[in-house]
Regions:
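Extended recognition/assembly regions associated with phosphoester-bond processing machinery
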Residues: 1-129
Length: 129
């Protein structure tokens, strides 16, 4: 829109800044564990006009977000004893436009833990719920 520029480069920059802020908080408070609750990570198929405005299709969004999120978790795992990751099924990640027509589980957010468990399986202090 005219007030805000957002693309995958901006997303990467924002996630990197957010990660640095979390690390600063960890250092300040000597936090041992990090808890991440994630939802609404992509713009699904709920509004056709929004879908057409997105510069990445649904699958590219998921791949981009999954890689960036995994990198964030990898970075945080170096500073915390444990990193616990929870994902919550959101409304915007639906794969069906009409909420009434959507079946339980038809949501891209549900795929994220599956991907993260495979990607981060060798990180003993990362726990994907």
């Amino acid at each position: 829109n005219f007030k805000n520029h957002f693309d995958e480069n901006e997303l990467k920059k924002r996630i990197e800044n957010y990660t640095l802020k979390i690390i600063q908080i960890q250092k300040l408070h000597q936090a041992e564990n990090c808890y991440i609750v994630a939802s609404e990570l992509i713009s699904g198929l709920i509004h056709n006009n929004l879908r057409l405005q997105n510069n990445l299709d649904l699958m590219e969004q998921f791949k981009t977000v999954s890689l960036l999120f995994a990198t964030m978790i990898q970075d945080l795992s170096q500073y915390f004893n444990n990193v616990y990751v929870y994902t919550v099924e959101g409304n915007h990640s639906r794969v069906v436009a009409k909420k009434e027509d959507s079946l339980q589980g038809e949501n891209m957010d549900i795929l994220l833990p599956f991907y993260l468990q495979a990607k981060l399986q060798n990180y003993q202090n990362v726990h994907i719920q």
